[in-house]
Curated annotation (Swiss-Prot):
Keyword hit for Repeat: yes
Transcription listed as a keyword: no
Sequence repeats: 37-40, 45-48, 53-56
Keyword annotations from UniProtKB, A to Z: Cuticle, Repeat
Name of the protein in question: Cuticle protein 79, isoform B
C-alpha cells in the first residue's frame, strides 16, 4: 500500500513497483490501478509537485491534439521502510518515456498558387543563393 510511497495520482505503468504517480507523488499501491483518462491529457511538469487527492477526481477534457513530443519523466527514488524488523529498501524507478501532447496549435495555412520566381543564376551556380 501506501507505506513510504506517498499518495499519488496513480498513472499505472505496468510492473513499475510502487507506481509512478501522475501528480508526482508515489502511489504505493495506486500505481497499478492507474487513471484511465490521464494519459491523454499528459502533464509534463507535474512530477515535482505531487497532487494528493487526485485518484478520486476524473477530469474530462477535450483536447485538440497539438504536436506530440516525447517526455522522459525524471527517475523516482522510492524508499520503503518495513517494520519490524527495520528494513530499508531503496530502489530507483526509471519510468518509461511518455508521449505528451503539446499545446494546441492553430495553423493558418496559405497555399499560394504556383509562383514562378525566376532567379537569374550567374555562371558560378546556386551557391550565391545560400549566402
Amino acid at each position: 500500500g501506501f507505506l513510504g510511497g506517498g499518495y499519488g495520482g496513480g498513472l499505472g505503468l505496468g510492473g513499475y513497483g510502487g507506481g509512478y504517480g501522475l501528480g508526482g507523488g508515489l502511489g504505493g499501491g495506486l500505481g497499478a490501478i492507474g487513471l484511465a483518462a490521464a494519459p491523454a491529457v499528459g502533464i509534463a511538469a507535474a512530477p515535482a509537485i505531487g497532487i494528493a487527492a487526485a485518484p478520486a477526481t476524473l477530469v474530462r477534457t477535450r483536447v485538440v491534439p497539438g504536436p506530440a513530443r516525447l517526455v522522459q519523466p525524471p527517475p523516482v527514488v522510492q524508499k520503503q521502510v518495513i517494520q519490524p524488523p527495520p528494513i530499508v529498501q531503496t530502489r530507483l524507478i526509471e519510468p518509461p518515456a511518455q508521449l505528451v501532447q503539446g499545446p494546441p496549435q492553430v495553423i493558418h495555412e496559405q497555399t499560394p498558387a504556383l509562383i514562378k520566381t525566376a532567379v537569374p543564376a550567374p555562371s558560378f551556380g546556386y551557391k550565391s543563393l545560400l549566402h
